[in-house]
Amino acid sequence: MSHLRMLVMIEEHGQVSAAAAAMNMTQPAASRMLSEMEAIVKSPLCQRASRGVVLTKFGEALALARRARTILLELREASRELNQMKSGSGGSVYIGAVTAPAISLVVPAIRRAMDTYPGIEINVQVESSNVLARELLAARHDFIIGRIPDDFDPGLFSIHEIGIERACLVVREGHPLMRGEPVTLQDLSGYDWVFQPPGALLRRTMEDVFLTHGVAMPRNVINTPSVVLTLALVCNTNAIAPIAQDMAEFVAGQQADMAEPAFCQRISNSWSSLTASLPPKAGSCRPAPACFMIWCWMKAVS
């Protein structure tokens, strides 16, 4: 198992020395371990690059990096579940979600899971769908809730449509747009905007809104994937931002200095619960993740 961990660390850090440090061993020991793996497969698994090392085509062809992650994850979970069987409690789940379902679906499921599985370990990553899809294929999650990235083959996933993500435009309390006068999309384009990075689905959706209405895109744009920074900018400037409706309602419920402008373009995007496609005999989700996914689905359709 140490050999597999070493390969994963080399892929992540791009340097044998950094991989060795991550595993608390010396670089000569790490190099020797790499040589042992290459002797086993009778092919070089790494090669020097401009900065450190990268996997060779043999390493990629064997999919050792991804398979190693899967094997390590399964071994880790098997060990944990054996311990939990002995203690009569627990379970674990690794889930990724985009912002809206993280608030509306994952949080309620967490509450229910903690009641049903005393001692359960819940690991949640909130990120963009592109990042989550890559993480899922790397065996870092049991399932994710997000959109289907355009540049991913849907055949790589088991996909279950579970809901619609709604978004809205938000500004701070006291914003000039909140004076009660009729507001048009043209009025909004003159303000600063906070967008997700180019290519993000919500960003593309807003670009389509401007294009459909024949209105030029705002000139002053701040790009950030951070929801926290987006809200901070909205609450402290005259900027406008499109965010998930669930997030807007959550923040408004915390009495933050944020409100919807008189013009509110509702945006609907679908999001799905995805699990990585597995070989026929690989089995389905473990009990805790399976229940967690069912609870998310039940909340979505309720």
Curated annotation (Swiss-Prot):
<dbReference type="Pfam" id="PF00126">
    <property type="entry name" value="HTH_1"/>
</dbReference>
<dbReference type="InterPro" id="IPR037405">
    <property type="entry name" value="GbpR_PBP2"/>
</dbReference>
<keyword id="KW-0678">Repressor</keyword>
<keyword id="KW-0805">Transcription regulation</keyword>
<dbReference type="GO" id="GO:0005829">
    <property type="term" value="C:cytosol"/>
</dbReference>
<dbReference type="InterPro" id="IPR036388">
    <property type="entry name" value="WH-like_DNA-bd_sf"/>
</dbReference>
<dbReference type="InterPro" id="IPR036390">
    <property type="entry name" value="WH_DNA-bd_sf"/>
</dbReference>
<dbReference type="GO" id="GO:0003700">
    <property type="term" value="F:DNA-binding transcription factor activity"/>
</dbReference>
<protein>
    <recommendedName>
        <fullName>HTH-type transcriptional regulator GbpR</fullName>
    </recommendedName>
</protein>
<feature type="domain" description="HTH lysR-type">
    <location>
        <begin position="1"/>
        <end position="56"/>
    </location>
</feature>
<keyword id="KW-0804">Transcription</keyword>
<dbReference type="InterPro" id="IPR005119">
    <property type="entry name" value="LysR_subst-bd"/>
</dbReference>
<comment type="function">
    <text>Activator of the expression of chvE when bound to its inducer and represses its expression in the absence of inducer (L-arabinose, D-fucose or D-galactose). Negatively regulates its own expression.</text>
</comment>
<keyword id="KW-0238">DNA-binding</keyword>
<feature type="DNA-binding region" description="H-T-H motif">
    <location>
        <begin position="16"/>
        <end position="35"/>
    </location>
</feature>
<dbReference type="InterPro" id="IPR050950">
    <property type="entry name" value="HTH-type_LysR_regulators"/>
</dbReference>
<dbReference type="Pfam" id="PF03466">
    <property type="entry name" value="LysR_substrate"/>
</dbReference>
<dbReference type="InterPro" id="IPR000847">
    <property type="entry name" value="Tscrpt_reg_HTH_LysR"/>
</dbReference>
<keyword id="KW-0010">Activator</keyword>
<comment type="similarity">
    <text>Belongs to the LysR transcriptional regulatory family.</text>
</comment>
<dbReference type="GO" id="GO:0003677">
    <property type="term" value="F:DNA binding"/>
</dbReference>
